[in-house]
Amino acid sequence: MISMNPIMIRNNLSRSSSPAAPPITNHTSTVDYFSLKPKLSLDTSSQNDSISTQSSNNDDTHSDQQDHTLYTHNHYFDDDYDDDEDEDFDIRDQLLDPFDKITISNCNEEYYSPLTPFDDQTTSPQDSIISSKSSNKSTTVVPPPQFQLTLPKLTTYSFLIVDDNIINLKILNRILLKLFPKCHIVQIQDSKLVKDILHKQPFDSIFIDIEMPDVNGIDIAQFVRQDSKFDDMGMVAVTTRNSTQDLELFKQCGIDCTFHKPLNYSLDFMANSIDDIIITRKNKI
């Protein structure tokens, strides 16, 4: 029998009591660290679950930040050129945005630059765009505005004005002087004096008011047309009475034309009407 000292017996007991160590095997795994780490954390005790979970999250965040920093550092110089291009496109868009808002359909609006004078003849960008497009097809010539210039007639007429209202006399006198600057005008406010004046001097035309005291316009018209000596004299009624019955009565009394008060007629119309009346009366003789 082999004798063993106490030290050897102790070593043998310690070796036999300890579990056999598993064999060491080297396996090449394709699993990365981030997928393996959650599995390793499951082997820990239940008391340290919360601590290990928090620490693993912190490690993951830290590692993600490192990876993001590495990725940003590695791709910084690669994206530099792209960033420059993006900035160029942004600046170009900012410059072209105001012109994109200009629409041809809104042609009434005008846009002014700081150096553009505020004049009625200023051409807006819309007009320039339309003109540039239409110039290739056809050219439209805008005629200059036409101004109607009334020239006074230089005929030396002689007129008689009869009206009981002094204001109406002055208004008609001023109008006749505008139409015929060289005419001679006699104004009578008292209608009873008309017969004497007509016998004393001839007139080319007489302008009478209808509603007057003592001798009205109808009385004067009948007196004039009863005497053949005044057949070549024109007669115009200037009155507020303009109904159909009144106009028919004036025509029967020998009145050639009627101007309604107030005299809102063009100067050309009044001048041509007076000329036609006088010429027609003189041609009948």
Swiss-Prot record:
The keyword Phosphoprotein applies. Keywords: Phosphoprotein. InterPro entries: Bact_response_regulator, CheY-like_superfamily, Sig_transdc_resp-reg_receiver. Residues 158-276 form the Response regulatory domain. SUPFAM superfamilies: CheY-like. GO terms for biological process: filamentous growth of a population of unicellular organisms in response to biotic stimulus; phosphorelay signal transduction system; positive regulation of filamentous growth of a population of unicellular organisms in response to biotic stimulus. SMART domains: REC. The modification 4-aspartylphosphate is found at D209. Residues 43-58, 128-138 have a biased composition (Low complexity). Residues 43-66, 114-142 are annotated as: Disordered. Required for stress adaptation, morphogenesis and virulence. This is Stress response regulator protein 1. It comes from Candida dubliniensis (strain CD36 / ATCC MYA-646 / CBS 7987 / NCPF 3949 / NRRL Y-17841) (Yeast). The gene is SRR1.
